[in-house]
Design a protein with these regions (language model features):
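Active-/binding-site microenvironments in catalytic and ligand-binding cores
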Residues: 1-174
Length: 174
């Protein structure tokens, strides 16, 4: 069994989407003063590796509470061609961004979820189109060039009430 970490490292003042608030990781308590160490983080739900769910880009989409953990885990394929987009399976895009033609194929074939390498960002209109069609998507996946053709993908969100997305610790097992 091999595991590949697909998550970006979160760190203080890391790059964020233009216009978003800065990531801040600060020392809230120290061992010397308080008897333990504790850091506090200030992040947007879309900083680093994260999952997008419909309410993020639609007026009446589903929020995180309406999903179960199984929705974020599944057998997946590394995208090489349109054949790799299959109903009920995940598909990860490492070497190609999603254009309108691919977005329409994705909606038609209904994969369990899709994911984009950190090399790419969704076109906002394409992202909204996919969210309107209830396609779960991951962004800023790291190390996608190390993925085999088939693998189990895990990208489980934090359990945040009524959330519109979440940071994830994503990884592949094969």
């Amino acid at each position: 069994m091999k595991i590949i970490d697909l998550s970006q490292t979160l760190y203080d003042h890391m790059p964020v989407y233009p216009g978003d608030a800065d990531v801040i990781i600060e020392q809230a308590q120290t061992f010397a003063k308080d008897g333990w160490n504790m850091k506090r983080i200030h992040i947007n739900l879309y900083d680093g590796t994260h999952v997008n769910i419909p309410i993020h880009g639609t007026k009446n989409g589903r929020n995180l509470d309406s999903y179960i953990i199984d929705d974020f885990i599944g057998k997946s394929f590394l995208f090489m061609s349109e054949k790799d987009i299959k109903k009920g399976y995940g598909v990860i895009f490492s070497d190609k961004n999603i254009d309108w033609d691919l977005a329409k194929i994705i909606v038609k074939r209904k994969p369990k979820f899709i994911g984009l390498s950190e090399k790419f960002e969704f076109d906002i209109e394409i992202e909204k189109f996919l969210l309107e069609k209830e396609i779960i998507s991951y962004e800023r996946l790291a190390n996608t060039q190390k993925l085999p053709k088939e693998f189990m993908f895990y990208g489980v969100p934090l359990n945040i009430k009524e959330a519109d997305g979440s940071p994830v610790r994503a990884f592949a097992v094969f």
